[in-house]
Design a protein with these regions (language model features):
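Unchanged
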Residues: 1-254, 365
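Left-handed beta-helix
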Residues: 1-10, 199, 209-371
């Protein structure tokens, strides 16, 4: 691995997941019952032998701090490696100054002390697998100033509406980085992942500050498309951009498909996470489970279909959970039917017997709520 350090960036003001983000940043969202979203970029880095990682947090840090901790569970070299949690002074979700550039500026001293020649930047709100070692090698071999990672999609009219898209020429040179306006179905979605020299990165941060206090890294890179050699590299495999509530629900549901899960999880590419000591899930005689992901520590007496169930959940006798994402420590009472819902932690669904939302507009049940 060439000498590179990693940055896991936080989400900007244009990204907001209704309901769930009231309690924690997207990186701390539960994913597939067992993981947190931030586990994926950090694991990609440690699997690629990047053992100096900076994680940037711009609001509600407690959940990320508790989960990431010192980073020991991410298999970071304890002698040469280090995971830093860095914070922004602009912690209002909708603050116009709440940008990745402002977060980097607040921590410029830590950035300036990194003596690695290259930096790899990945977002805390996207789920995918990639070998950053190969990504960096491709960048260096090409001679480009900056290399951006993108994913080709054919549903950009309905999805990825809070993402940026790339304009590419025939040689995969980047001509523009612009918001997805939903006017074309085929787009190259920018995965907010890039590699460049550390010296260039720091100079871009300073230049962006002088141009506009609202500038993001994508904005300054877009300005530099004509003067810098910026190239795109296509990503293959599973990709989910968790930038709004429907995309969070859809990403969990998509991975119930075995083929999609195989594109994300690989035998020689582990996704690390903080482990919990809990007993195996108990399945009682009345339990009926189909095409679902069930975490440890649950008690299942009812029916679970096409759903993700977090740790320590209780599904009582006669209960039906269908097409839903249920976070940890939720109780679904007897004969309660929930469908097309995201149920946040510690909720108790006991009195209202039918909680069903339209399939095209899944519902959300608040954390620690009782229905």
């Amino acid at each position: 691995m060439y000498k590179a350090f990693g940055i896991v960036s936080s989400s900007g003001r244009n990204i907001y997941v209704d309901g769930m983000q009231d309690y924690r940043p997207i990186g701390a969202f539960s994913f597939l019952g067992r993981y947190r979203v931030i586990d994926f970029p950090i694991s990609n880095m440690t699997n690629s032998d990047i053992d100096r990682i900076q994680v940037y947090i711009n609001n509600k840090p407690r959940s990320v701090v508790e989960h990431v901790g010192t980073g020991r569970h991410y298999n970071i070299n304890s002698k040469s490696g280090k995971l830093q949690l860095l914070f922004s002074e602009h912690n209002n979700d909708n603050d116009i100054y709440n940008t990745d550039i402002s977060c980097y500026l607040d921590n410029m001293e830590s950035l300036s002390r990194m003596n690695h020649p290259y930096v790899v930047i990945a977002p805390s709100y996207m789920v995918y697998s990639i070998d950053f070692d190969q990504f960096l090698h491709t960048h260096i071999e090409s001679g480009a100033d900056v290399t951006l990672l993108y994913h080709a999609v054919d549903n950009a009219k309905e999805a990825y509406l809070t993402c940026n898209v790339l304009g590419l020429n025939r040689q995969k040179g980047v001509e523009s980085i612009e918001p997805n306006h939903g006017n074309k179905k085929n787009q190259y979605v920018y995965m907010d992942t890039c590699v460049m020299k550390t010296e260039l990165f720091i100079s871009l941060i300073k230049e962006a500050k002088n141009l506009s206090s609202m500038y993001t890294l994508a904005d300054i890179l877009n300005d530099k498309c004509e003067t810098l050699d910026i190239r795109g590299v296509a990503h293959k495999g599973f990709f989910a951009s968790i930038t709004d509530f429907p995309s969070y629900y859809a990403a969990n549901m998509a991975l119930l498909n075995y083929k999609s899960a195989q594109e994300l999880f690989h035998e020689n590419w582990p996704i690390y996470t903080r482990t919990n000591d809990s007993c195996p899930t108990q399945y009682f005689n009345t339990a009926d489970v189909k095409n679902s992901v069930i975490s440890n520590g649950c008690q299942i007496e009812g029916t679970v279909e096409n759903s993700v169930i977090g740790r320590g959940c209780v599904i009582k006798k006669g209960a039906v959970v269908r097409n839903s994402v249920v976070l940890a420590e939720v109780t679904v009472g007897e004969d309660v039917h929930i469908e097309n819902e995201v149920v946040d932690k510690w909720a108790k669904l006991v009195h209202k017997k039918e909680i069903v939302s339209p399939a095209e507009q899944p519902g959300y049940i608040r954390r620690n709520d009782t229905l």
